[in-house]
UniProtKB/Swiss-Prot annotation:
Name of encoding gene: TBC1D30
Name recorded for this polypeptide: TBC1 domain family member 30
Polar residues bias locations: 858-870
A Pfam family matched in the record: DUF4682
UniProt record, GO biological process: negative regulation of cilium assembly; positive regulation of GTPase activity
Ranges where the Rab-GAP TBC domain occurs: 249-457
Membrane topology field: Peripheral membrane protein
Disordered: annotated segments: 1-76, 94-134, 541-564, 776-806, 838-924
Species assigned in the record: Homo sapiens (Human)
Residue numbers of Phosphoserine PTMs: 800
Cited InterPro entries: Rab-GAP-TBC_dom (IPR000195), Rab-GAP_TBC_sf (IPR035969), Tbc1d30_C (IPR032738)
MF (Gene Ontology): GTPase activator activity; small GTPase binding
Keywords tagged on the record: Cell membrane, Membrane, Phosphoprotein
Chain's role: May act as a GTPase-activating protein for Rab family protein(s).
Length: 924
């Protein structure tokens, strides 16, 4: 068919459409030729008579019934292209008749332009002309060069009416041509959508045919994109989940669009402004955290394992990979960068065809949404949980293999002597979980697994691991030692990666058929190990150097590179991910080589990590105890004892009693082991119950006058002037001067009010009895003042901070000599001696709760002292308080007939702490 343009004196295009034979090959040629002065007859399609005309809808429907379709995919595709081309040609003929219905030269010209315009690649040049007169085309071109409306109006005002009518007629004609083309494309779109919908219905019928015929399966409706509406996405999600379960899985042509649809829906659900996120994550400015992460990312790029990211020619691809990893580290600063991300990002970039933004979307959806929380955080807590859960699932599904591996582990522990062999599956499952099997299985199999992970969740990871161990179980059961097991697994790992040891369709069939979804008891196991597990040390993550052990880890890795290389070679079956366990295994070797450093490495010892890192694998105790209890049972008891001894020693060193000289002399520190623990005496609260007086006296700074450091015997008799300047008299004088301030303190008003009444009587007491106080009761107060809170020093309420004594040379070295001779294990003997030598002191000094009967008798003694002659005593007598019946029944006043005696030897000094001396001081 030859179509020749008309119109005198202007160039045209010659279009030749030639159909050769019945094969249906078409050739379109366009070339410039000289103008033809005469108009040829109307164009005629050669071969149109042999093929009857059909409607446009019937051509699309007859594509599937072409005779050549049975000859193969290529013949079917050629027939489809030919049918589409013929459909376009017949459509052009109909539009030609509709657009150029007139007769004569004008009608032929319009029909010619309509046909020629359909063969153009783009309609943008239609406005420029070439089909109408040269003058009209020049005018339209000049109009297009003036974009503003003002300039166009000025240009058109210069034209006469005939020229304007010609321009208007030409514009209307070309608008009609473009409208016809648009209508034709819309009709073609409708036909294609109808065909797609018909194919989707076929897929829906197939899915329902292979389903379990449940009620929810009847609602399956397959679509390529989520439809609008409330349940549109969920319907699409369920259908694609069913497609992923088929043996063929999701086609690779759909994978990119399917993954992006899932990621976009997640980002929309959390209300993320993606444009703003892209500007933040991919900006060229360097953040403070970028340097450390960038260094680690560059170190791991050569270990990616993908061929497209290795070699000198892949430099640009590595730059893109680094940008994606750095962008995710900026997005999720909690996770940052973890070793193994480079493998995940490389595979995602391959699916996303190198698009950085799309790859970042998939990483966010995979790590933040699909995988468990804290799967890649600093301590890999969720990873350790899944490793412990996997061992339990292995015992449930493959009991023989699990028992065989436990036997190999116990044998290795016995033969190694002081070493420790972790569970044999840990070395491999850690690598599988962190890289999602990208380093141990072929690429196509990994992508199918990832499709299932995106739709089914992280449960697929455990299922695939069980399926792999089940496949390799026959060869593993032949191993007799742990070394043979590692050698066999290294060989099998290479075969799985290179020789397709596992068929993808068989593997996925095993994954979906081993148990119903969700996996029974999986949620309970994860919850149990989540709250009963110690995660990996924080130093496992290379880029986050935090904590006090990180520096030691870094120094070990820097100082001992040979040891690290040896460990990496020992676990060479890990491939590009073999360096991940090197730091931990290196520490175990150091622990064996240097037993003297056991205490310093105890915090990083893998033997003390709970089920997430290691497990004793004692199957005989599994029925009675869970894994957490087994870990605690295997803990070294001697180590716990040594640790307890160190803690106790530190506490004893922190507890000390400080004796300060009253005249600003040197400070003498006495440890609690040098004094006897007896009740402290608060001189301002004499006569009160011990429960009410212990708080104010604890950790008190006791002032001892005249400490010269010499050792002399105590003087039995002193003159009256020296006795009046004793510490007790000084306390009385100070409180008489500060009476208003002292009475304002709770718990002290009653006692201070009685000091005046007995001050004169106390001055006339004998000298020998007056000497008994500093040697007996003062020492007792000093012994009681120590407590675990000894680092805090408090002054007794109402006491002057710097009391001034009349005689500053009073020597109390005898008190120190006696304190040094006392022992903690002679508490009772010392108490009895003091009772015999100093009866007045016993009368007024309360005893610890360990002697309730004596305390009860002592509390009753002051009641009878009012009617009898006052017994010689340096202490003022205090009127006892009326006791409350309710408090007595509750045991607040000590043991009675209704409240039995309870001894707390270690809590005797803190027994009365809640009372604090503030309650029970008001007279009733």
């Amino acid at each position: 068919m030859d179509v020749l343009p008309t119109g005198g004196g202007r160039p045209g295009l010659r279009t030749e459409l030639e159909f050769r034979g019945g094969g249906g090959e078409a050739r379109l040629e366009s070339q410039e030729e000289e103008t033809i002065p005469a108009a040829p007859p109307a164009p005629r399609l050669r071969g149109a008579a042999e093929r009857p005309r059909r409607s446009r809808d019937t051509w699309d429907g007859d594509e599937d019934t072409e005779p050549g379709e049975a000859c193969g995919g290529r013949t079917s595709r050629t027939a489809s292209l030919v049918s589409g081309l013929l459909n376009e040609l017949y459509s052009c003929t109909e539009e030609e008749e509709a657009a150029g219905g007139g007769r004569g030269a004008e009608g032929r010209r319009r029909r010619r332009d309509s046909l020629d315009s359909s063969t153009e690649a783009s309609g943008s040049d239609v406005v420029l002309g070439g089909r109408s007169g040269a003058g009209d085309s020049r005018v339209l071109q000049e109009l297009q060069e003036r974009p503003s409306q003002r300039h166009q109006m000025l240009y058109l005002r210069q034209k006469d009416a005939n020229e304007l009518k010609t321009i208007l007629r030409e514009l209307k004609y070309r608008i009609g041509i473009q409208s016809a083309k648009l209508l034709r494309h819309l009709k073609q779109k409708d036909r294609l959508l109808h065909k797609v919908q018909r194919n989707c219905d076929i897929v829906t019928a197939c899915l329902q045919a292979v389903s379990q015929k449940r009620r929810v399966d009847t609602k399956l409706k397959f679509t390529l994109e989520p439809s609008l509406g409330q349940n549109g996405f969920q319907q699409w999600y369920d259908a694609l989940k069913a497609v992923a379960r088929l043996s063929t899985g999701i086609p690779k042509e759909w994978r990119r669009k399917v993954w992006l649809t899932l990621a976009d829906h997640y980002l929309h659900s959390i209300a993320i402004d993606w444009d703003k996120t892209m500007r933040f994550t991919f900006n060229e400015r360097s953040n403070p955290d970028d340097d450390s992460m960038g260094i680690q990312i560059v170190k791991d790029l050569h270990r990616t394992g993908c061929s497209s990211y290795c070699g000198q020619e892949a430099e640009q691809d590595r730059v893109v990979l680094k940008r994606v990893l750095l962008a995710y580290a900026r997005w999720n600063k909690t996770v940052g960068y973890c070793q193994g991300f480079n493998i995940l990002a490389a595979l995602i970039l391959e699916v996303m065809e190198g698009n950085e933004g799309d790859a970042l979307k998939i990483m966010i959806y995979l790590i933040d949404k699909v995988l468990p929380e804290s799967y890649f955080v600093n301590n890999l807590r969720a990873l350790s949980v899944d490793m412990a859960v996997f061992r339990d699932l292995l015992r449930m599904k493959l009991p023989e293999l699990s028992q065989h591996l436990d036997t190999l582990q116990r044998t290795a522990n016995k033969e190694s002597g002081g070493g420790y062999e972790p569970p044999l599956t840990n070395v491999f499952t850690m690598q599988w979980f962190l890289t999602l099997f990208a380093t141990c299985l072929p690429n196509q199999t990994v992508l199918k697994i990832w499709d299932s992970v995106f739709f089914e969740g992280s449960e697929i990871i455990l299922r695939v691991s069980l399926a792999i161990w089940a496949k390799l179980g026959e060869q593993i059961e032949c191993c007799e030692t742990a070394d043979e097991f590692y050698s066999t697994m290294g060989r099998l790992t290479q075969e799985m990666l290179e020789n397709d040891l596992l068929q993808s369709h068989e593997l996925m069939q095993t994954v979906y058929s081993m148990a119903p979804f969700p996996f029974p008891q999986l949620a309970e196991l994860r919850e149990k190990y989540t709250y009963n597990i110690t995660p990996f040390p924080a130093t496992v993550k290379p880029t986050s150097v935090s904590g006090r052990h990180s520096k030691a880890r870094d120094s070990d890795e820097e100082n001992d590179p040979d040891d690290e290389d040896a460990v990496v070679n020992a676990v060479g079956c890990l491939g590009p991910f073999s360096g991940f366990l090197a730091p931990e295994l290196q520490k175990y070797q150091k622990q064996i080589k240097e037993p003297n450093e056991e205490q310093s490495l105890r915090s990083n010892n893998i033997a003390e990590l709970s089920p997430g890192a290691i497990n004793s694998c004692r199957s005989e105790y599994h029925a009675a105890f869970n894994s957490m209890m087994m870990e605690r049972m295997t803990t070294d008891i001697n180590a716990l004892k040594r640790q307890y001894s160190r803690i106790k020693k530190k506490q004893q060193q922190q507890v000390h009693q400080v004796y300060i000289r009253a005249d600003k002399g040197p400070v003498t520190s006495i440890l609690p082991s040098q004094v006897n623990s007896s009740p402290v005496i608060n001189h301002l609260l004499l006569g009160k119950k011990m429960k009410m007086t212990n708080r104010a006296a604890k950790n008190a700074v006791i002032h001892i006058p005249g400490h010269t450091g010499g050792k002399i015997s105590p003087v039995p008799y002193e003159d009256l002037k020296t006795k009046l300047n004793s510490p007790w008299r000084t306390h009385i004088r100070v409180h008489k001067k500060n009476m208003p301030r002292t009475k304002s303190h709770p718990g002290c008003g009653d006692t201070v009010g009685l000091i005046d009444e007995q001050n004169e009587a106390s001055k006339t007491n004998g000298l020998g009895a007056a000497e008994a106080f500093p040697s007996g009761c003062t020492a007792t107060a000093g012994r009681e003042g120590s407590s675990p809170e000894g680092s805090t020093r408090r002054t007794i309420e109402g006491q002057s901070p710097e009391p001034v004594f009349g005689d500053a040379d009073v020597d109390v070295s005898a008190v120190q000599a006696k304190l040094g001779a006392l022992e903690l294990n002679q508490r009772d003997a010392a108490a009895e001696t003091e009772l015999r030598v100093h009866p007045p002191c016993q009368r007024h000094c309360p005893e610890p709760p360990s002697a309730p009967e004596e305390n009860k008798a002592t509390s009753k003694a002051p009641q009878g002292s009012n009617s009898k002659t006052p017994i010689f005593s340096p202490f003022p007598s205090v009127k006892p308080l009326r006791k409350s019946a309710t408090a007595r029944n509750l045991g607040l006043y000590g043991p009675t007939e209704r409240t039995p005696t309870v001894h707390f030897p270690q809590m005797s000094r803190s027994f009365s702490k809640p009372g604090g001396g503030n309650s029970g001081t008001k007279k009733r």
